[in-house]
Amino acid sequence: MRKRNISLKSKIEIQKIFKEGKLIRFSNLNLKMFYKSNHLVYSRILVTFSKGFRGSVKRNRIRRLFKEAFRKRLELLEGIALDIIFVVSYSKLTLTYFSIESLMKGLVLRCERGIGESK
C-alpha cells in the first residue's frame, strides 16, 4: 500500500489558501494558521516560517514535530478534508512535541467547527 502524502506542495494551491482561507492567530506563540477545505479525501499540511526565523536545524525540527503531530491526529479529521498552513514567526520559540500535539488537537476541533458553520 502506498504511503499517503500529507504535504501541501503546489504553489498555486498555497497562494489560494493564503488568499481565500480562514486565519487563526496565536499571538502568545507567534503562530498563524490558515486553513481551507479541499477537494481531496484527505487533509494536507504545510509548515512555513517567516524570513527572520534563523537556524535551519531548529526550522526543520519544528517542521518535523508539526508533521508528526498532524499525522497522529488524522483520525480526528476523519471525513473532513482540509489544507492547513502553519506560519511560525519567531526563532526563540521553545516548542515541544507535547505542546504542538495539544495545540494541534485544539486547532483540529476549532477547524471542524469553522468548516461546519460554513456548510
From Swiss-Prot:
Q: EC number(s) in its UniProt entry?
A: 3.1.26.5
Q: Tell me, which GO biological process terms does this entry list?
A: tRNA 5'-leader removal
The protein depicted here goes by the name Ribonuclease P protein component
Q: Name one GO cellular component term.
A: ribonuclease P complex
Belongs to which family? Belongs to the RnpA family.
| Catalysis: reaction(s) | Endonucleolytic cleavage of RNA, removing 5'-extranucleotides from tRNA precursor
- Assigned keywords, A-Z: Endonuclease, Hydrolase, Nuclease, RNA-binding, tRNA processing
Which EC class is this protein assigned?
hydrolase
Q: What species is this protein from?
A: Borreliella burgdorferi (strain ZS7) (Borrelia burgdorferi)
Q: Which domain of life is it from?
A: Bacteria
**Which SUPFAM superfamilies does the record cross-reference, listed alphabetically?**
Ribosomal protein S5 domain 2-like
Protein function:
RNaseP catalyzes the removal of the 5'-leader sequence from pre-tRNA to produce the mature 5'-terminus. It can also cleave other RNA substrates such as 4.5S RNA. The protein component plays an auxiliary but essential role in vivo by binding to the 5'-leader sequence and broadening the substrate specificity of the ribozyme.
The major lineage groups are:
Bacteria, Pseudomonadati, Spirochaetota, Spirochaetia, Spirochaetales
Instruction: Cite the record's note on assembly.
Output: Consists of a catalytic RNA component (M1 or rnpB) and a protein subunit.
Gene Ontology MF annotations: 3'-tRNA processing endoribonuclease activity; ribonuclease P activity; tRNA binding
- Specify the signal sequence span: none
